[in-house]
């Protein structure tokens, strides 16, 4: 799935970014013309129609793409689940016994929720490189917040534990504050890009997050949390650079 930074930023914040509609490819001001003046569900559906054509790079193609989309300034893999890893892009084979052994492909929306179906399984917007061990500890738990973690990655960067977020008390995976906005925007993108599918992503723990409909797509506690995350962690240069690389 290829999507420009303008697309992703808009989709991520579709409930309150009408002011961005004037932008488009090469600043032509035409890309979002069909969605001008819309709001709420109508806006989301209009954006879905605009971005739905896409190119599927395939699951096996993700690792090669990561070399462009998730490269740190020092040439290592940009891992948002761990702050202590220094993976080379070839460090994606073999097993892991501890944090730092290898990285793999993490589905921010667990693929078990949508039964590993395509094209979601290989959508590089939401399938990101992360430490394999920490990814495994995340399992298919929803994203959330915990104040009594049962597991923390090195230096307390990521956490697993009972939710302290109002509206949900189950086990959650809490990413670091500096990436919560990134994840929120990915989730809004997924709700928009797959508007015609997301209602069925309720397998396993999916029903704790997915509302079973096109709009608003997520359960109230999730929407409230994601909007707060998006506000508290605005779009970073790292996020812009990644989206630009994905678009290429």
Predicted regions mapped to residue ranges:
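Short, His- and charge-rich active-site/binding loops that engage polyanionic ligands
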Residues: 77-79, 83-102
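Short amphipathic alpha-helical surface micro-motifs
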Residues: 59-64, 85-86, 91-93, 111, ...
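A generic structural signal for short, non-catalytic loop/turn and secondary-structure boundary residues
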Residues: 11-13, 72-73, 98
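Intrinsic disorder/low-complexity detector
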Residues: 9, 29, 81, 245-246
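Bacterial Sec-dependent N-terminal signal peptides
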Residues: 1-25
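Intrinsically disordered, low-complexity segments enriched in small/polar residues
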Residues: 22, 27, 56-59, 92, ...
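N-terminal module-boundary/linker segments of secreted carbohydrate-active enzymes
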Residues: 21-86
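Domain-level detector of nuclease and nuclease-like folds
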Residues: 95-248
């Amino acid at each position: 799935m290829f999507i420009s930074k303008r697309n992703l930023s808009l989709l991520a914040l579709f409930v309150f970014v009408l002011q961005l509609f004037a932008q488009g490819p090469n600043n032509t001001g035409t890309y979002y013309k069909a969605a001008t003046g819309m709001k709420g569900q109508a806006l989301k559906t209009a954006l879905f129609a605009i971005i739905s054509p896409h190119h599927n790079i395939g699951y096996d193609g993700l690792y090669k793409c990561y070399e462009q989309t998730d490269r740190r300034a020092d040439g290592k893999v940009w891992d948002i689940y761990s702050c202590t890893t220094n993976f080379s892009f070839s460090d994606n084979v073999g097993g892991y016994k501890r944090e730092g052994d290898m990285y793999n492909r993490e589905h921010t929306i667990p693929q078990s929720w949508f039964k590993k179906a395509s094209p979601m399984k290989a959508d590089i917007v939401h399938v990101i490189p992360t430490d394999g061990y920490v990814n495994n500890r995340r399992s298919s738990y929803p994203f959330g917040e915990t104040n009594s973690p049962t597991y923390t990655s090195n230096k307390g960067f990521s956490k697993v534990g009972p939710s302290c977020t109002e509206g949900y008390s189950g086990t959650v995976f809490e990413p670091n504050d500096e990436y919560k906005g990134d994840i929120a925007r990915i989730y809004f993108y997924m709700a928009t890009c797959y508007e015609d599918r997301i209602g069925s992503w309720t397998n396993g723990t999916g029903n704790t997050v997915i509302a079973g409909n096109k709009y608003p797509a997520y359960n109230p506690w999730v929407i409230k949390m994601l909007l707060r995350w998006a506000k508290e962690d605005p779009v970073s240069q790292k996020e812009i650079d990644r989206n630009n690389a994905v678009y290429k």
